[in-house]
Amino acid sequence: GLSGRFVRIDQKKYGKILLPLITPYDENEEIDYGKYAELIEYVITNDLCDSLIVTGTTGEASLLTFDERVKLFETAVKASAGRKPVIAGTGCASTKETIALTNKAYDLGIELALIVCPFYNKPTQEGLYLHYKTIAENTKANIMLYNIPIFVGVNLEAETVGRLAAIPNIVGVKDEAGVNPTQVTDFFLATEKVDPNFVVYNGDDIMLLPTIVQGAMGIVSGGAHIFGHEIRAIFEAFEKGENEKAKELFVPMYRFCKT
């Protein structure tokens, strides 16, 4: 069943709060890699998260070149210096390019890739399945699927996630389906018999509490740059059974994210 998922997550390397780093630019719109290293230092020193994500949606991945993304991976690995795990956002519209970028990240020592559904082309569910299957078969990295229909144009359906969970190096999914906050439960139901260790992360700050209640292992939170400690307090309250406290902590965050 779905109970007991919470106790297992602490043994996981990546923790509950995955922070997708913003990408800093200078006044000429060139990436400021020095500032990026400083940001990583700030986030780690202040313990705002458990893991760092490089070039996710918050990092404006779709605006970066292949080489810029690789250089950001290198910068993050060096700056974090093993203190917190680094996860590489390697999703591209093209399957081939995604494989190449994922393997670059893996060669730099990044074991987990967060791979967004191929955007703009609106693939079918079978197309999504084949995209991820092909990537998984051509990399040693572990893969976290990333569903964000508002930007991709297609929802990664629970049935497809269930099929993908059977592939050994596809280990989890990040769900940002704001239109369907209960999809987290659908993902659990689709995967629990296929891979009981398959992890489901929420990807939307305003859905933090509703998805924790459904059993989400954690959150991918851009807001953690600002309120990482508050997110941690919400998790802790919920795990202690202090539901009223969790709600009290969540409401101001919800209001902030809504504005």
For every predicted segment, state its role.
Residues 151-259:
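Catalytic alpha/beta core domains of metabolic enzymes, predominantly
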Residues 1-5:
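Universal eukaryotic N-terminal targeting presequences
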